[in-house]
């Protein structure tokens, strides 16, 4: 009984709130702290960064454990409380088999940043990459990606690839147009290697995510930045011990733009965090055509447009919750290029919020609940869905069984009476009379 109680306490303590980045838990020999490098299906590849003191007491053991790549699964209780593990997360790994390089993710450290499209954690910088042609640059699609990037509050850089496919006049037109959007884009060409120095300087010593539609050259840019442009990965920088078949030191697969649709083909299937020779990491992400904008609300949308931010910086609107659609005292006028895009996105978000309000209401419960245990110590446990994880009470189960047995006995007795020859003879005699 005491052993079961002790196990229960350990189970609850492991469900404590997300670990603080400054906090270093005491590690066992079968535990380690690492970073999630890639996620595919139900498996995570984690790069070990810190191990227990008993393991690192020997220099040989230290070098053999730090930098090892582990193939991990996520603890089931984390899935129950919807504590999602993302690429880029700093995690606590337990139950490690150092021979087979396998383990289980037990907890997640607090994230300093997070993005949804694509799902990556602890991002320092966003590189929004589009192509000027093949596929052709569409202003509304570009606006949608920029709004999604602005909503994360993470520093971003806009880069336009494939400059060799358009004329100088078109290039100058896009420069002037994007400056009107309050952006200073970087122009580059992966094919001719033009403009890559500026991009490499911006991405240096940071964890950066490259986002954009399929076919704009994200994987090609990563291949150039990791190999040809940077001169290759130096031998001393190979402190990782990757597994066979991973993507850490291989070129990313690239594909051609479809000649029929004019759009790119999906060659990258999952998010991967890749080291760069000049320092930092790059996240290669699957291309998608439309960001979801799930974290953008009707009130936060305006702050995702630099034009509106500049208008309301010096003079405020008459109402705090102004949506800038012609309200009295609104300082935002409709004489700027992307105002129709703002109205279109605002209508989309308002329809989504009204649907969510009708469907889910306003009450939302946390995925974790806390109970006060011995000595007033709080323990966390998952808040499970009542109809999915809760079992029925024994009293209700017994009542259901009794009622089912009664119905069965009634049916059985009726069947027995119908087949009884004496009863049938009496019924026939009554019919003759």
Swiss-Prot record:
Cofactor(s) this protein cannot do without: Zn(2+)
Record-annotated CP-type G domain positions: 113-291
InterPro entries reported for this sequence: G_CP_dom, NA-bd_OB-fold, P-loop_NTPase, Ribosome_biogen_GTPase_RsgA, RsgA_GTPase_dom
Matching CDD domains: YjeQ_EngC (cd01854)
Region (Disordered): 1-20
Amino-acid positions noted as binding GTP in the UniProt annotation, renumbered to this chain: 212-220
Any one GO molecular-function label of the UniProt entry: GTP binding
Subcellular location: Mitochondrion
Null mutant phenotype: Embryo defective.
NCBIfam families: ribosome small subunit-dependent GTPase A
Sequence similarity: Belongs to the TRAFAC class YlqF/YawG GTPase family. RsgA subfamily.
Name used for this protein in its record: Small ribosomal subunit biogenesis GTPase RsgA 1, mitochondrial
